[in-house]
Amino acid sequence: MDVIYRSGTKLIWSSSMNDDRQTSSEDKLKGFEWWRRSLQYRTGLGLDEEEKLQFEHDYRVKNLPQKCDSCIEYRDWMFKYSPSVKFMMEHVQKLGGNLSSKNITCDMCDGMKGGGFHPEMGILLCSNWIKDKWQLEDILTHELVHAYDHLKFKVDLTNLKHHACTEIRASALSGECRILNEIKKTGLGDFGSKFQACVRRRAAISVSANPNCSSKEEAESVVNAVWESCFNDTRPFERVYR
């Protein structure tokens, strides 16, 4: 079943994937060759479109049972020990939301997305793209902010300003744009603006994938239009602490 999540892209809420591509041979999925392909994918050097698509397919299917088990293990650990996840779960519950392991699920996703939220189905964590426990914490907190916003503000995702606002808040409050993460990606330059630049970038990418958005430029314009009010709204947190 196809559903629309936070970015407006389609993720698949089942283990069946619309991908007829054949998985690469075993020697390309391990050791030096896998490391080489991973590095090539990250840098884009010497990588054509077909090789890019093949790597994404191989990454999705590589060690799937172990990835799903790890995702469930990380999720359950966060339920018990993550301050941000526990805090957001409590506030979603106060608003009448009912989220638990029954509707916060780990599964395969079609496309390079970490997760998604759907008002009726809950939260999806993309086990085939989650690298470690701490990435899952950021993703789950992000989606819990969307769940909170849906209940608190009655977000209408067909309204681009609504979509932009919840994306700004989710990226700002989840920890995914923390300074150390951005330094690893982009170096020390423009240190003071890294956090806000990351939030703007992520929000615009998500809005640009909304079917009602006509272009990247429109997405950026909408993000800018709601930026001040949405970036400074840290509810239910007192401030951005991650």
From Swiss-Prot:
Keyword Protease: yes
Coiled-coil features, chain-numbered ranges: none
Protein name: Mitochondrial inner membrane protease ATP23
PANTHER family (alphabetical): MITOCHONDRIAL INNER MEMBRANE PROTEASE, MITOCHONDRIAL INNER MEMBRANE PROTEASE ATP23 HOMOLOG
GO cellular component terms, A-Z: mitochondrial inner membrane
One Pfam family of this chain: Peptidase_M76
Annotated InterPro entries: Peptidase_M76_ATP23 (IPR019165)
Keyword entries, A-Z: Hydrolase, Membrane, Metal-binding, Metalloprotease, Mitochondrion, Mitochondrion inner membrane, Protease
Keyword Hydrolase: yes
Active site: 143
Predominant place of localization: mitochondrion
Chain sites annotated for binding a divalent metal cation: 142, 146
GO annotation (BP), single: mitochondrial proton-transporting ATP synthase complex assembly
Protein location: Mitochondrion inner membrane
Function: Has a dual role in the assembly of mitochondrial ATPase. Acts as a protease that removes N-terminal residues of mitochondrial ATPase CF(0) subunit 6 at the intermembrane space side. Also involved in the correct assembly of the membrane-embedded ATPase CF(0) particle, probably mediating association of subunit 6 with the subunit 9 ring.
GO molecular function list: metal ion binding; metalloendopeptidase activity
Membrane topology (UniProt): Peripheral membrane protein
Family classification: Belongs to the peptidase M76 family.
EC number: 3.4.24.-
